[in-house]
Structure formats: structure tokens, C-alpha cells
């Protein structure tokens, strides 16, 4: 029961641009190569984020802000700063949560935790073009490239129907939209992005 609650909490954390046209096959190949090359060059990332959670049964969307810090290969600190304080740290096979001062830890060694951890890290880095895991469609808009991904994994599909990544001109992710099977969705916009700046090891410890 506790694991189900944590999974739902993580997914709640994460789940339009102008007129779009589909990229040609050649354009898609070129963009994927550019995004992969850019991703390989990123060792660390820090950013502020704004999150909007839309639930059909609520008249008003839930808006939160916070900060993230990411270091390859698998260290991630996702911190909400307003209107409440909540922090979750992924490191190897461990998830540590600080819920307004109450710290708990668990092993992330089951299949769904691993899938979610990989999903979050890949979403931030933009490295999500594994066609064994996703069906991928790419579109060009006035602001950059929009990637629409449909998960193929049946376990992940229980939690996530579609994933939309919006890339800036430098092939890094500006915005993420996660759509659940219920059509509820989460939009996350990254601002003040910094790449390859030093991050103290203490950031990934609670």
C-alpha cells in the first residue's frame, strides 16, 4: 500500500505551442542525432521549474514551483519550494523523501520504480528516443521541436498514456507534459537552466 502511494506521488509530480507540422524522416533523424549528442554532453543540470497539475474533478489547476538538480548517471534531486515543501532524491536504487521535515527511504529495486526513475531522468535529459520503449512522433512548431511519445510497456501504460517533450533550439527540454489514462495531466516548464556546473554531493543526500 505504501509503495502504491509513493508511486502515485511521484507521478503526480510529473504528468500549446503554435501550429505544428510533422518532421520528415530525414528531419527526424537529424533532430534525434542532435538531441542524443547534446544529451551525451550534459553531465549535470540545474533548473527552476513551474508545474501545473490538471485534474478533471477540480475547478482550478494545482500550481507549484521548485528546483531540480541532476547529475549523471542517476542522481536526481526534485524539490518543491512553494506552496509547500517536498523533496525527493533518486540515487542508484534508493529513493529518499523529505515531506516537510519527515524523512523516509526505500529501495527502488522493483520493476515499476525502476521504470519511473528511468522515465523521470530521461524526461529531464531529453534522452527518450528508444523505440523499444516508445512510439515516437516529432513535430516542428514556432518554438522548437515537439516530441510525442506513446509508452509500449504495459506496466508504464497503467500510469502514463502519453508523454510530450518540447525542445528548445539547443535540443534541450523546455517543457514536459505527462498525460494519464484518465486524461488528467501534468505540465512542467523548466526555466533558468544551467548545464555542466558543479553540484556538491550533499545535494543528493537528505
Task: Name each model feature, range by range.
Residues 52, 73-75, 81-84, 93-95, ...:
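Solvent-exposed coil/turn segments that connect beta secondary-structure elements
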Residues 105-144:
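Flexible, surface-exposed loop/linker segments and immediately adjacent secondary-structure boundaries
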Residues 21, 67-118, 186:
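An acidic-aromatic
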Residues 56-57, 84-87, 154-157, 173:
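Short beta-strands and strand-coil junctions in structured, solvent-facing domains, enriched
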Residues 47-49, 63-65, 90, 190:
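Extended beta-sheet lipid-handling architectures
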Residues 129-135, 140-206:
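Gly/Pro-enriched, hydrophobic low-complexity segments
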Residues 4-15:
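Sec-dependent N-terminal signal peptides
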Residues 16-50, 54-60, 203-206:
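N-terminal leader/targeting segments and the immediate start of mature chains
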Amino acid at each position: 500500500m505504501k509503495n502504491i502511494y509513493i508511486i502515485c506521488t511521484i507521478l503526480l509530480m510529473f504528468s500549446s505551442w503554435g501550429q505544428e507540422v510533422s518532421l520528415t524522416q530525414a528531419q527526424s533523424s537529424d533532430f534525434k542525432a542532435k538531441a542524443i549528442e547534446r544529451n551525451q554532453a550534459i553531465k549535470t543540470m540545474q533548473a527552476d521549474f513551474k508545474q501545473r497539475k490538471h485534474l478533471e474533478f477540480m475547478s482550478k489547476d494545482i500550481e507549484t514551483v521548485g528546483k531540480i538538480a541532476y547529475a549523471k548517471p542517476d542522481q536526481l534531486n526534485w524539490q518543491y519550494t512553494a506552496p509547500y515543501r517536498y523533496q525527493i532524491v533518486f540515487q542508484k536504487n534508493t529513493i529518499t523523501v523529505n515531506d516537510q521535515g519527515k524523512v523516509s527511504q526505500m529501495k527502488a529495486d522493483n520493476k515499476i520504480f525502476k521504470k519511473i526513475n528511468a522515465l523521470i531522468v530521461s524526461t529531464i535529459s531529453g534522452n527518450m528516443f528508444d523505440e523499444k520503449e516508445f512510439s515516437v512522433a516529432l513535430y516542428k512548431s514556432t518554438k522548437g521541436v515537439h516530441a510525442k511519445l506513446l509508452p509500449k510497456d504495459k506496466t508504464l501504460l497503467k500510469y502514463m498514456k502519453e508523454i510530450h517533450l518540447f525542445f528548445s533550439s539547443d535540443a534541450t527540454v523546455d517543457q514536459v507534459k505527462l498525460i494519464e489514462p484518465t486524461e488528467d495531466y501534468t505540465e512542467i516548464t523548466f526555466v533558468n537552466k544551467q548545464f555542466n556546473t558543479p553540484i556538491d554531493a550533499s545535494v543528493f543526500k537528505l
